[in-house]
């Protein structure tokens, strides 16, 4: 459960995003635990010290009592509002936001065929990384991708801003591309039972 300042706009059984973006140095250090940021390793858009810790959790509301909101499933991340508020780069402390989405979307029993570069080079060009990206699953809950073959694609599928999505019984073949299935800014995504039969360079073999 979380307590919000005003729960009047929230409804039972609706989906919301529990989110934070904060670059308080103490908060960044807590998030990284024993890890350290290597100067120059990432570009400015991915600098956690500048842009802050970003957390997005997607939840369905089970009950609302006053301003206390309880979700159907446990919260994954500690919600600590004691760190100072970060006000730069459009950031914010913990808050609950409405989450427009689609539900019960299934994609199955299909083949997606592309023609990605034979001499793939990681981040070599836009053609290497993304010329053939047939499928994206965005803002979905309780949805799935199964029994699908991806042939010679740059990136098979990205699951973004989604929750409770399953991806399984997937085959990759043909020419090897940039990536297969990835989950980004999502909660509770299962990716399993995938088989890679593609041919081509490995990431560490340019």
Label every PLM stretch briefly.
Residues 1, 7-8, 27-121, 128:
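Small/polar beta-strand repeat architecture
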Residues 84-98, 121-136, 152-155, 174-183, ...:
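Extracellular beta-strand/beta-solenoid scaffold signature
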Residues 21-22, 74:
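Short, surface-exposed secondary-structure boundary micro-motifs
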């Amino acid at each position: 459960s979380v307590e919000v300042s005003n729960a009047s706009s929230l409804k039972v059984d609706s989906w919301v995003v529990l989110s934070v973006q904060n670059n308080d140095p103490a908060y960044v250090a807590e998030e990284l635990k024993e890890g350290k940021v290597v100067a120059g390793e990432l570009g400015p858009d991915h600098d956690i010290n500048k842009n802050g810790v970003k957390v997005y959790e997607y939840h369905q509301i089970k009950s609302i009592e006053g301003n206390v909101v309880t979700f159907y499933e446990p919260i994954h991340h500690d919600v600590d509002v004691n760190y100072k508020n970060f006000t730069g780069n459009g950031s914010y402390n913990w808050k609950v936001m409405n989450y427009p989405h689609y539900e019960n979307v299934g994609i199955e029993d299909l083949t997606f065929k592309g023609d990605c570069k034979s001499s793939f080079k990681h981040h070599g060009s836009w053609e290497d990384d993304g010329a053939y990206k047939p499928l994206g699953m965005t803002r979905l809950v309780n949805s799935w991708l199964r029994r699908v073959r991806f042939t010679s694609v740059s990136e098979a599928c990205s699951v973004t801003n989604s929750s409770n999505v399953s991806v399984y019984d997937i085959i990759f073949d043909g020419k090897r591309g940039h990536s297969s299935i990835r989950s980004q800014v999502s909660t509770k995504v299962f990716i399993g039972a995938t088989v890679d039969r593609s041919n081509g360079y490995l990431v560490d073999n340019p």
